[in-house]
């Protein structure tokens, strides 16, 4: 094919792909299957590889990702991205309306109108378009500046790479100059569930918002694309023909190719606002995405500037947040799950009950001390709560409704999977199955941990496949994974030659992971990712680590006598030694390589601990940012700790830091230090 014909076909393919993108993401009226869409995209990518000079920044092929971003540069926002003041009280919403009406009256205005919109539970971002082309995308950050994550945002199909302008009467002027669009990146419920199913149980995200925040900060844009996120726009500024009202600007955004909140409604007073909040209190659970409240804004945009803002939030808007959802049900029984370390976790079996838009039949009871604290018995009426978490929890017993016949929840004497007698080490809350080598549940858990994202990140090795491998005797530990053949894998349920080869390719790729990741992947009790990094730095080979005594190990930063004893105990086990031999023969990294260059030295000499819930970062990734800037992460507060980063609902660690006089900062200050 010559260049002219390729250019013609590329143009047709781009137009067709963007048309189907719009039908799928904006209008929910798909005309072709995912398979047919992928064929169009693959054809475009093939032609652009053959004629790279024809690639443009707004081509649909640029959504696929593939680049690695070593660090995210800082972008200063043109206007501050303020957070909204929020409330859980309808009365406080009414107070807000009264204040606004008084301020508007003082400005000589009439009765104001409001726009009520659903509050998407996602991550706020800013998009900058120059002459209609996306040139920059950034996070909210501290409100004044954020991280530039354009490469990751390009992978989101509902973010236009080039703005459309089909409705000239609505706009009245060309899309020239710089236009800023703000909105929320979020993850649909089905995409979130699919992502969590791929991860081991202990590494699953608590909710779609956490998954979104973590995904946006990934350095691999191809992985961002694979996770499937969405975007809803709610702010437009910089366009010469922008409408005078917020509702009309939402229409303009839709005409430009953005998805906007479908439920946005003009409200003329508090009665209509209260009706909207009440209506969506239940209806929101039927939506394919998470919403956690209602945003209320003045419709007349000219009033926004006149009313202004406080240091933290605008005076012309407020967010009403729905309270945590609770429901009453009956605890019908308890089952016991076995974790990778043999931990026995009680799980409540409930009378199926609707909660937060879904039918709940199970909830966690955490451990036997929690059962004792609650005083819960089988047959009790209990209150369950879901507040952002995927798994609901039992929060109380309705003692007034306790039936005459209830049964105590007894600690099992044997492992529910392998039948081994359970043990409870002195000073421990949990009971354990001591059959490490033989218990199928522990084998499955260890292998899933080994393959998890923060360990060796072995794609395509999910729970269903690992269960088959263990149950059929093909794999007993992580070392056996590297002896698997395509024939063995292809013979398993829901596997074929292609999917089997994908697993083998992922296993081969895992051999290139770091020595520190391997130490974490081994699943040594008390050794998390941070401790594994300290070990890798202090003991640069597995052989040297195995030879160290407890005293030498305890001298390693962040280790101490308990972890040191756990490490020695782990390496003394014959099955562990056999597994390490298999891993070494397979070519896994048994010693440290060259250390990665630091981003900067902003945290050099700092011993840092995070406590409480961060709003804009996933804990593990925030910790990695500290390490990349020369700092150390510690697991507990002591006199040696130099910095505590406190998020929402920070608890005992914050209290201890204050008592010891350790410096405490919030998330905004942390971001400024980066």
Curated annotation (Swiss-Prot):
Pfam families: BRCT, DNA_ligase_aden, DNA_ligase_OB, DNA_ligase_ZBD, HHH_2
Alphabetical list of CDD domains matching this protein: BRCT_DNA_ligase_like, LIGANc
Binding-site positions, Zn(2+): 415, 418, 433, 439
Chain ranges of the BRCT domain: 598-674
Binding site for NAD(+): 34-38, 83-84, 117, 140, 184, 297, 321
Keyword check for Glycosyltransferase: no
Broad EC category: ligase
Keyword terms, alphabetized: DNA damage, DNA repair, DNA replication, Ligase, Magnesium, Manganese, Metal-binding, NAD, Zinc
Function, as annotated: DNA ligase that catalyzes the formation of phosphodiester linkages between 5'-phosphoryl and 3'-hydroxyl groups in double-stranded DNA using NAD as a coenzyme and as the energy source for the reaction. It is essential for DNA replication and repair of damaged DNA.
PANTHER family: CHROMOSOME TRANSMISSION FIDELITY FACTOR 18, DNA LIGASE
UniProt-annotated catalytic positions: 119 (n6-amp-lysine intermediate)
E.C. numbers: 6.5.1.2
Disulphides: none
PROSITE patterns, alphabetized: BRCT
Annotated source species: Chlorobaculum tepidum (strain ATCC 49652 / DSM 12025 / NBRC 103806 / TLS)
InterPro entries: BRCT_dom, BRCT_dom_sf, DisA/LigA_HHH, DNA_ligase, DNAligase_adenylation, DNAligase_N, Hlx-hairpin-Hlx_DNA-bd_motif, NA-bd_OB-fold
Name of protein: DNA ligase
Gene of this entry: ligA
NCBIfam families: dnlj, PRK07956.1
Gene3D superfamilies named among the record's database cross-references: 5' to 3' exonuclease, C-terminal subdomain, 6.20.10.30, BRCT domain, DNA ligase/mRNA capping enzyme, Helix hairpin bin, Nucleic acid-binding proteins
UniProt keyword Cytoplasm present: no
Enzymatic reactions: NAD(+) + (deoxyribonucleotide)n-3'-hydroxyl + 5'-phospho-(deoxyribonucleotide)m = (deoxyribonucleotide)n+m + AMP + beta-nicotinamide D-nucleotide
């Amino acid at each position: 094919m010559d260049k002219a014909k390729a250019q013609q076909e590329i143009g047709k393919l781009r137009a067709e792909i963007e048309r189907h993108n719009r039908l799928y993401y904006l209008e929910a009226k798909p005309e072709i299957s995912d398979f047919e869409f992928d064929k169009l995209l693959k054809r475009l990518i093939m032609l652009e590889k053959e004629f790279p000079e024809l690639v443009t920044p707004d081509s649909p092929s640029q959504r696929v990702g593939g680049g690695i971003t070593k660090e995210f540069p800082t972008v200063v926002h043109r206007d501050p991205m303020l957070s909204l003041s929020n409330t859980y009280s309808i009365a406080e919403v009414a107070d807000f309306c009264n204040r606004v009406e008084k301020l508007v009256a003082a400005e000589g205005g009439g009765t104001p109108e409001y726009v009520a919109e659903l509050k998407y539970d996602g991550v706020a971002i800013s998009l900058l378009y120059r002459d209609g082309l996306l040139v920059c995308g950034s996070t909210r950050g501290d409100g004044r500046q954020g991280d530039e994550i354009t490469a990751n945002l390009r992978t989101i199909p509902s973010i236009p790479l080039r703005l459309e302008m089909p409705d000239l009467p609505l706009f009245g002027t060309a899309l020239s100059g710089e236009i800023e669009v703000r909105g929320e990146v979020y993850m649909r419920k089905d995409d979130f569930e699919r992502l969590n199913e791929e991860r081991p149980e202990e590494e699953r995200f608590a909710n779609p918002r956490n998954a979104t925040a973590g995904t946006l900060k990934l350095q691999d844009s191809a992985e961002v694309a694979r996770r499937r996120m969405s975007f809803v726009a709610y702010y437009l500024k910089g366009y010469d023909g922008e409408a005078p009202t917020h509702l009309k600007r939402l229409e303009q955004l839709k005409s430009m190719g953005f998805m906007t909140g479908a439920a946005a409604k003009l409200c003329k007073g508090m009665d209509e606002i209260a009706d909207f909040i009440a209506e969506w209190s239940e209806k929101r659970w039927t939506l394919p995405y998470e919403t956690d409240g209602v945003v209320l804004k003045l419709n007349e945009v000219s009033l926004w500037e006149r009313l202004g803002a406080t240091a933290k939030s605008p005076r012309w808007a407020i967010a009403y947040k729905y309270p945590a959802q609770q429901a009453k049900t009956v605890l019908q029984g308890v089952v016991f799950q076995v974790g990778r370390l043999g931990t026995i976790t009680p799980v409540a079996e409930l009378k199926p009950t609707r909660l937060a838009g879904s039918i709940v039949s199970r909830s966690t009871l955490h451990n036997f001390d929690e059962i004792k604290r609650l005083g819960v018995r089988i047959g009790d009426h209990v209150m369950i709560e879901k507040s952002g978490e995927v798994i609901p929890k039992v929060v109380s017993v309705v003692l007034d409704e306790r039936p005459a016949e209830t049964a105590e929840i007894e600690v099992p004497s044997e492992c529910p999977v392998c039948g081994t007698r359970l043990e409870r080490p002195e000073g421990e809350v949990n009971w354990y199955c001591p059959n490490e080598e033989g218990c199928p549940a522990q084998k499955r858990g260890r292998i899933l941990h080994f393959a998890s994202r923060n360990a060796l990140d072995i794609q395509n090795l999910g729970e269903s496949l690992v269960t088959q491998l263990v149950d059929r005797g093909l794999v007993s530990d992580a070392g056996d994974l590297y002896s698997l053949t395509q024939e063995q894998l292809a013979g398993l349920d829901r596997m074929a030659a292609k999917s089997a080869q994908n697993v083998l390719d992922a296993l081969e790729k895992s051999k290139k992971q770091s020595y520190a990741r391997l130490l974490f992947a081994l699943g040594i009790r008390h050794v998390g990712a941070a401790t594994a990094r300290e070990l890798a730095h202090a003991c640069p080979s597995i052989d040297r680590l195995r030879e160290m005594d407890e005293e030498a190990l305890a001298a390693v930063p962040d280790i101490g006598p308990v972890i040191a004893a756990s490490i020695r105990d782990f390496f003394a086990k014959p099955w562990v030694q056999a597994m390490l031999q298999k891993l070494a023969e397979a070519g896994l990294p048994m010693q440290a390589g060259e250390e990665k260059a630091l981003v900067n030295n902003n945290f050099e000499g700092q011993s840092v601990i995070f406590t409480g819930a961060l709003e804009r970062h996933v804990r593990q990734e925030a910790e990695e940012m500290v390490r990349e800037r020369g700092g150390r992460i510690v697991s507990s507060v002591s006199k040696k700790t130099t910095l505590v980063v406190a998020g929402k609902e920070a608890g005992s660690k914050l209290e201890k830091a204050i008592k010891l006089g350790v410096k405490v900062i919030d998330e905004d200050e942390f971001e400024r230090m980066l």
